[in-house]
């Protein structure tokens, strides 16, 4: 049942090749009608790294796998002893692995309104989080068997980095760091039929082309479909720390868009009895207007007052994980 089941890819080995195969597995699960799926972030068995969490080559693999985890339905690190993957195992503030993990942890929390609303679509309309590109771009022959990137919901194009760029290992599996200032690239295909805004920079590119995206260790290629409405939540340490009474709404222009913001009591099954609300938002690209419709429904403790901060995304404005400014 898409209402109750959650599957994961099993206790997989920590290697780049295995990580790449998990991506294809997740796409296949989605096509089989199983929307809630994840993989053990960083892999489960770190045999190829001498089971040593201090192995610098393992740090790179774990960071890249963790970045991808932000755009999985369930984000879950799970590893075999003696490897522990708490963030403090990867250094401290100022260390490249620690900082990258912290950055993407915060990003996951900021995306909660988007995630929760997408989960409602999964429940109410038999939707899916992970969407092979053929689902949204069936007329583009280049995406029919593409297993390196996917749509997350209807708005995000996600291209995980699945190659080692900044570390290497000797014959004894010891890890060594390369020069992090020598930035590597990852190939990204932008599907034909839409334009795409770089989540990190705000630059918009035309679809139907392959690009080389620079990928510093703290950047995974993420693009937002032009004509998207993205609710952006508060910075929190746990999911219910702050109410959603002051959300930012990022508008990615270039086409008409709509998004339904879903809310409920967050911690029970009362939504099955109708205890939830929805707010439909529509963007008219020609008129450059955003319409926020009246809230429908009700539930105990729902907000009586709220503020939406509207941001029209452009280079340097409404980009990445930074605080939005009007």
Language model region names:
Residues 219-325:
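Accessory, solvent-exposed terminal regions and/or long lumenal/extracellular loops of proteins
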């Amino acid at each position: 049942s898409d209402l109750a089941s959650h599957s994961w890819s099993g206790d997989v080995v920590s290697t780049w090749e295995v990580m790449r195969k998990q991506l294809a597995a997740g796409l296949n699960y989605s096509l089989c009608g199983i929307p809630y799926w994840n993989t053990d972030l960083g892999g489960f068995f770190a045999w190829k790294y001498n089971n040593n969490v201090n192995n610098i080559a393992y740090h790179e693999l774990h960071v890249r796998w963790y970045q991808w985890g932000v755009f999985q339905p369930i984000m879950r690190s799970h590893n075999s002893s003696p490897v522990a993957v708490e963030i403090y195992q990867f250094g401290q503030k100022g260390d490249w692995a620690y900082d990258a993990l912290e950055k993407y942890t915060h990003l996951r929390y900021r995306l909660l309104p988007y995630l929760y609303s997408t989960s409602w679509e999964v429940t109410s309309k038999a939707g899916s989080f992970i969407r092979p590109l053929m689902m949204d771009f069936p007329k583009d022959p280049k995406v029919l068997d593409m297993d390196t990137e996917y749509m997350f919901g209807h708005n995000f194009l996600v291209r995980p980095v699945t190659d080692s760029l900044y570390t290497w290992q000797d014959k004894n599996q010891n890890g060594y760091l390369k020069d992090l200032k020598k930035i590597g690239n990852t190939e990204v295909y932008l599907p034909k039929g839409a334009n795409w805004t770089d989540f990190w920079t705000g630059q918009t590119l035309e679809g139907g082309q392959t690009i080389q995206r620079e990928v510093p260790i703290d950047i995974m290629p993420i693009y937002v479909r032009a004509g998207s409405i993205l609710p952006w939540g508060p910075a929190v340490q746990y999911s219910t720390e702050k109410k959603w009474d002051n959300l930012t709404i990022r508008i990615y222009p270039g086409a008409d868009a709509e998004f339904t913001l879903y809310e409920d009591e967050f911690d029970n099954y009362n939504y099955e009895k109708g205890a939830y609300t929805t707010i439909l938002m529509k963007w008219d690209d020609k008129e450059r207007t955003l319409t926020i419709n009246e809230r429908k429904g009700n539930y105990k403790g729902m907000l009586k007052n709220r503020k939406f901060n509207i941001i029209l995304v452009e280079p340097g404005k409404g980009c990445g994980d930074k605080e939005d400014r009007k």
